[in-house]
Amino acid sequence: MNVQIEESWKQHLAPEFEKDYFIRLTEFVRSEYQTATIYPPGRFIFNAFNLCPFDKVKVVIIGQDPYHGPGQAHGLCFSVNDGVPFPPSLQNIFKEIQSDLGAPIPTSGNLTRWANQGVLLLNATLTVRAHQAGSHQRRGWEEFTDAAIRVLAEQRENIVFILWGSYAQKKGAFIDRNKHLVLASAHPSPLSAYNGFFGNKHFSRTNEYLQAHGQTPIEW
């Protein structure tokens, strides 16, 4: 199957594209786009991969589901398009960056600038029906994104994996802590941010680790 995804990822994930689950997933997603309003727009489904080639990945942040409101999702977890109000979790992420690094709250919630520096902003599920959170879960996306995380964890070294909340922590449970830095805390959602997300200093800790391993820090 010829999947429109960045070339290095296409090579590393090629076995997945031929598996039965992925063929079924593709048929389901194609049908959904034809019959319902689906986010993100089709050209952005693999945006996280397209902006961040396999060998350029320094950091992986694992999200769960795309935003399901109009104009928000563009294929990067937690990120929104320019001009879109910050969802609460993103607002809290920026607050933690401000507290941790002293950086001002940005004017845009578009995290393409992180992706361009090697931050893979990967949702576990890559599509969703408008206004129906979780509507495309358990259709095969989770298996596909597990494969992407696994191939990174096995074939690369010294990546920072950031796991916020129990869902992301379960998804990243297999990552070898001797080869990579795994940072885990509560989720930035208002429901849990005060239970260990605020004050986790994940952004400074990421940069310290990258610099210790000869890599350029991220401009958060």
Swiss-Prot record:
Chemical reaction(s) catalysed: Hydrolyzes single-stranded DNA or mismatched double-stranded DNA and polynucleotides, releasing free uracil
Entry keyword Iron-sulfur: no
GO BP field: base-excision repair, AP site formation via deaminated base removal
One Pfam family from the record: UDG
Compartment list: Cytoplasm
A Gene Ontology term for the protein's cellular component: cytoplasm
Domain of life from the UniProt record: Bacteria
Active-site residues, record numbering mapped to chain: 65 (proton acceptor)
Record SUPFAM superfamilies: Uracil-DNA glycosylase-like
CDD domains cross-referenced by the UniProt entry: UDG-F1-like (cd10027)
SMART domains: UDG (SM00986), UreE_C (SM00987)
EC number(s) reported in the record: 3.2.2.27
Keyword Cytoplasm: yes
Gene3D superfamilies, alphabetized: Uracil-DNA glycosylase-like domain (3.40.470.10)
Keyword terms of this UniProt record: Cytoplasm, DNA damage, DNA repair, Hydrolase
GO MF annotation: an example: uracil DNA N-glycosylase activity
Function, in words: Excises uracil residues from the DNA which can arise as a result of misincorporation of dUMP residues by DNA polymerase or due to deamination of cytosine.
Family from the record: Belongs to the uracil-DNA glycosylase (UDG) superfamily. UNG family.
Protein name as annotated: Uracil-DNA glycosylase
Species of the source: Phocaeicola vulgatus (strain ATCC 8482 / DSM 1447 / JCM 5826 / CCUG 4940 / NBRC 14291 / NCTC 11154) (Bacteroides vulgatus)
